[in-house]
Every structure is written in structure tokens, then in C-alpha cells.
Amino acid sequence: MANEIIIVEGKSDSQKLKKIYGENLITFETNGLGIDDKKLNSIKELSKKNKIIIFTDPDGPGKKIRETIIEFLDVDVFNAFVSKQDIDKNSKKIGLAEASEEAIKKALDNLITYNKKNISISWDEYVKNDFYIKANRIIIANHFNLSEDMSSKSLFKWLNWMNLKVKDIEKIIGE
């Protein structure tokens, strides 16, 4: 994972990844929702020479951190996702550090590129094709290991960030 920096929420996430991939892995910790302008500017500087991978927890704060970073950067951002189902059932926390090694490797092997400048689907297309309906949102969310609770507006934004077209989304729903 040379020239890659994985953005995580905390120390336990970094420790988990380094246990799997070795101590040479480079992570950047946001300290949860404590991500501020100084950290965002540090990530922006790092993005000039490195591939940025966001790997946050599969919960509300993780989603918020991910959105904050993507909206701040002017480059492609790579995203790794684990689902809540990948978390140890005995854990009280829903975090990356509690995910299985297999789930973490699968997530990092299947990165999704986001770019905030993408506009691949209009709101009219989104509504006309019933992508906003909860049942369809859940199918789409599960396909990408996103939260099933994601709002219609958030999913619309994220589908554009992924540069998905109507036919791509129809294929996902039809699977």
C-alpha cells in the first residue's frame, strides 16, 4: 500500500490495520468527529502526493467524517466500507477495530472512488426511477456497505460522487 494513506477515526483502528498489513502502513487518525480545519488541511496536503483512502466506522459519525473529508478535498477520494454485519457480534462498539480481518481485507480490495465534482444522475432521474423509495435505497446501500438509514438526499449525493448512471443503479436494484 505504498503512497496510500488510510484515514481512520482512532488509534484502535490504526492498530487493527497495522496488525493486518504491518507497521509500515500509514494511517491518519481524525480522532472521531474531532476533525477540524487543521486536520483537513493536513489531509489535503497529503492528498497532493498520496492516494487518500477513507475507512471510517459504519455508523453516523463515520458517515459524517467521510462526507466532511470528501467535500473538503478537490481530488478523487477512495473509500473502503465495512458493514455493521461485519462487526463482532459480542462487541459493544460498531467500529472498524471490531471488524473481522476478512471484512477489512475485502473492503480495501474493493475501493469505491468518490469525486464531489461528479454529476452523473439528475434529481429528476433519481425520482423518476424510484431510487428514492426506501426499499430501493436499502438495496443500493447494502450493495455498497452503506448505512440502510441513509436519507434519500444523502444517497443521491453519494451516487453522484460514485459517478453512477441510471443503468448502473438499475442493475444493482435488479440483482
From Swiss-Prot:
Domain Toprim span(s) in chain numbering: 3-83
Recorded catalytic activity of this chain's protein: Endonucleolytic cleavage of RNA, removing 21 and 42 nucleotides, respectively, from the 5'- and 3'-termini of a 5S-rRNA precursor
Enzyme Commission number, as recorded: 3.1.26.8
Alphabetical list of SMART domains matching this protein: TOPRIM
UniProt GO MF annotations: metal ion binding; ribonuclease M5 activity; rRNA binding
GO biological process: rRNA processing
Any one of the GO CC terms: cytoplasm
Residues annotated to bind Mg(2+) 1: E9, D57
Keyword Cytoplasm among UniProt keywords: yes
Main location: cytoplasm
UniProt cofactor note: Binds two Mg(2+) per subunit.
Lineage top rank: taxon: Bacteria
Function of the protein: Required for correct processing of both the 5' and 3' ends of 5S rRNA precursor. Cleaves both sides of a double-stranded region yielding mature 5S rRNA in one step.
Family statement drawn from the similarity comment of this UniProt entry: Belongs to the ribonuclease M5 family.
HAMAP family associated with the record: RNase_M5
Protein name: Ribonuclease M5
The species this protein was found in: Mesoplasma florum (strain ATCC 33453 / NBRC 100688 / NCTC 11704 / L1)
Gene: rnmV
